Amino acid sequence: MSNNQILFERAQKTIPGGVNSPVRAFRSVGGTPRFVARAQGPYFWDADGKQYIDYIGSWGPMIVGHVHPEVLSAVQNVLADGFSFGAPTEAEIEIAEEICKLVPSIEQVRMVSSGTEATMSALRLARGFTGRSRIVKFEGCYHGHADSLLVKAGSGLLTFGNPTSAGVPADIAKHTTVLEYNNVAALEEAFGAFGDEIAAVIVEPVAGNMNLVRGTPEFLNALRALCMKHGAVLIFDEVMCGFRVALGGAQAYYGIAADLTCLGKVIGGGMPAAAFGGRRDIMAHLAPLGGVYQAGTLSGNPIAVAAGLKTLQLIQAPGFYDALTAQTKRLADGLAAEARAAGVPFAADSIGAMFGLYFAERVPGSFAEVTKSDVERFNRFFHLMLDEGVYFAPSAYEAGFVSSTHDDAVIDATLAAARRAFAALAA
C-alpha cells in the first residue's frame, strides 16, 4: 500500500471524506488523492516521493510558482514580528493601495480571508446599498459556498431558484435567480421582468469552475449596460481570474468596469487572503461608516498580506504577462495538436495564465455545453497523465493554471507525456 493510500485511510477517520475541500478527494476521477509533502517552482512531491508537474497551483494562487524566494523572504521577514494582531497595520494600507492602483474600478477595498467571505460580503453590501433583495447569478459560475449562492435555476425564468446543497433553506434560495451564462436574451428578459428588484448581478467574467469558459464581450457589455440602467450593482467575481488573465484582471482584459470586485487566490500569494472592493459610494455603506456589517478576526493577517503584497509586486515586472500568456497558449495549443494527431476528439483554450481542456469537438460557451464533454475519457486521460507525473485538476469541470516557473522544458515534458496518453486513449 502506498503512503498516499495509508494517509487517505487515516484521514477519513477524522476528516469528512478525508479532505478539507471536496474536489481533493478524487471522487470525480476515482483513485487515491495525492498527499503533498512539499513543492517548489512548477513541481510538487507526494507522500511517496514522486514528483509531479503541477497545473493546479493551489487552484490559482501560485502564479509565480511554489516557494518563490522573494515571497518566502517577505514572509520570513514578518514572522518574528507577530502572527496576528486584530488591529490595523501599515502593510494593510500598502496592499490596499496596490490593489486600487492595479484595478482602477476599485476605489476602496476591504480585506477578508477567503473568496467565499468576499462574495458573501459583496452581496450583503449590494443589498444594503440598493435596498433590494434579488440576486442574479449564472449557471456554472461558482462564487463560494454561501447559502444564497448554492442555487440552481428553476424550471423557468420566473420560478424561484432551487438549492443545490442540503442545508440551504428554500426561503433563501428564492431570492437568487439563475440564468444561462453568455445568454444575452435571457439577461434582457430577466431585467425586463423584474429589473427594479435586482440588487446585484454577480458573474465570473472568466469562469473557471465549469472548466474554463470565457464570458463573451457582448454578454459582459450587456450586463454592464443593464445594471447601470436598472440601478443594480454589477459584481465581478475575480477571485480566480483576477491577476490571472491580465495584470488588471478580466476588467482590464475586456475593458469593462464593475461596481464591486471580489479578489482572492493571487492576492494572498498562497496564504489565506481575499478582498472585495469597488466604488467609494458603495463601500461607504460598510461598517464602521455605514449600516452593512462585515468583520473578520484574521482579515488583513500580516503574514498573508506580506505574501500577497510581494506577489503583486512581482507580477508587475515588464513582460511578465506576455510571457505567461504565451506559455499557457503553447500548452493548450500543444495538447490540442497532440490529441488531433492521435485522432482523439479534444479542444483546449487559454486566456492569460488559465486554460481549459475539453473532450469535445469544440470549446464550450456555457455550462450546458461543458456537460456534453466526454467525462469518462477525461478521467482516463487524467490518470494516464498522473502516472506520467503531470497533475491536472481532478475534475472535468475545473480550469488549470500555469505559473511563471513553467518554462519550455516543463511544457515540453508535459506535451511528451500527453502524446503517450492520447495514443493510449486512441488505442
UniProtKB/Swiss-Prot annotation:
Gene3D superfamilies: Aspartate Aminotransferase, domain 1 (3.90.1150.10), Type I PLP-dependent aspartate aminotransferase-like (Major domain) (3.40.640.10). Pathway: Porphyrin-containing compound metabolism; protoporphyrin-IX biosynthesis; 5-aminolevulinate from L-glutamyl-tRNA(Glu): step 2/2. The keyword Isomerase applies. GO terms for biological process: protoporphyrinogen IX biosynthetic process. GO terms for cellular component: cytoplasm. GO terms for molecular function: glutamate-1-semialdehyde 2,1-aminomutase activity; pyridoxal phosphate binding; transaminase activity. The keyword Isomerase applies. Pfam families: Aminotran_3. It is found in: Cytoplasm. It catalyses: (S)-4-amino-5-oxopentanoate = 5-aminolevulinate. The modification N6-(pyridoxal phosphate)lysine is found at K265. Its EC number is 5.4.3.8. Its cofactor is pyridoxal 5'-phosphate. Keywords: Cytoplasm, Isomerase, Porphyrin biosynthesis, Pyridoxal phosphate. NCBIfam families: hemL, PRK00062.1. Belongs to the class-III pyridoxal-phosphate-dependent aminotransferase family. HemL subfamily. Homodimer. This is Glutamate-1-semialdehyde 2,1-aminomutase. It comes from Burkholderia orbicola (strain MC0-3).
